[in-house]
Amino acid sequence: MLIEGRLVDDGRAVRVETDGPRIARIEEVCSAASPTRWISPGLIDIQVNGFGGHDANAPDVTPQVITDLVRSLWRRGVTALCPTLITAPESALLRACEAIDSACSADPLIAHSIPCIHAEGPFISAEDGPRGAHPREHVRPPDYDELGRWQEAARGRLGILTVAPELPRACELIQRGTTDGLLLAIGHTAASPEQIRAAVDAGARLSTHLGNGAHAVLPRHPNYIWEQLAHDRLTASLIFDGHHLPPAVMKTMVRAKSLERVVLVSDSSAVGGLSPGVYDTPVGGRVELQADRRLTLYGSPLLAGAASPLSVGIANAVRLAGLSLTEAVRLSSTNPARLLGLDRAGRGVVRAGASADLTVFRFTPDDEDLTVEVTLVAGEAVYEADSGAG
């Protein structure tokens, strides 16, 4: 396949040729077909609860639901995603793990697009604020044996675990999980600075949606947000949907962590991508999606999750946080690829010999979203805007 456009990395007008699952060559051309048509590494979203009406946390989740979730995000330029399971009874988590594994086993492209599962609960704080929208009745202490049962149901596909380090035996779980090859994250926590430091020493490497899943009011200092910002061993995932973090906080967190240690995530729910309206959801109950993609509890101003794809986060990083398009895409492709170890397979970059996971889109700095034209997964055009594929 031949694709022309400007490389997000350096703005060069190029023709990219793919051969099977790899990029065969990249040649400079006199000028791109359009100065606003960009070629980037495929977008990678490590926190996705659902999208387009497809819910990884639905009580009746099936392999088809997972497949449809992946396909709905191909249309938004996402070539890899981590289906994210929130706090639920063990039976529900096992069922979701089995559904995700079955979807991956049935289709190599789906497997390529799901590098791992992210378990965002249930080993989190039960306090209001840090717990977020997770159901209190299913929050429980860390249990390494239960974690093993999830992994068995997923046939080894579980890759990220978010945990509150103040819980009993949390640091032991972090240490054992890290030894097992999991990426351990701190999130939905009310931990003290000392407990944050202990978690980092035990092996935690990620802060899950830093600045959210937190108390509405915190001590000026010290607190668990400052402590996580200060640790160079922690990468921070951030929700840039325009509602979860104000622009000043977006800018400050990126500057504090540096571009090397930030990953953008959507944290999207199943109502993401749907028309504005009122919806009944498995998590959060009745919610209302506003025209500006703000998702709230019905009749309340309180957020009930996120409803924007990762592409909106990239646009907001440019419009609201002052990043360049190059930087914003890096936080949404190259950085998560490195965090998950996908860079070792040539993902997260556009160069000869790399994996042909590509997103082609149009964008100007005033746009509120990317306009995705082509999505390639392992060299296959899984979405083309003018054909409706995907």
Region locations from a protein language model:
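Alpha-helical scaffold segments that flank or form the walls of functional sites
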Residues: W38, I46, A58-H112, E137-A153, ...
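His/Asp/Glu-enriched, well-ordered alpha-helical/loop segment
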Residues: N223-S237, G242, V254-S266, G272-A354, ...
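Divalent metal-dependent hydrolysis catalytic cores, especially in the metallo-beta-lactamase
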Residues: N49-F51, D55, T67-A96, S113-S125, ...
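Metal-dependent enolase-superfamily TIM-barrel catalytic cores that perform enediolate-based chemistry
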Residues: C97-G121, E127-A191
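N-terminal metal-binding scaffold of metallo-dependent hydrolase/deaminase domains
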Residues: M1-S31, E380-A381
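Active-site core of metal-dependent hydrolases
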Residues: G148, E152-P276
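C-terminal cap of metal-dependent C-N hydrolases
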Residues: R347-G390
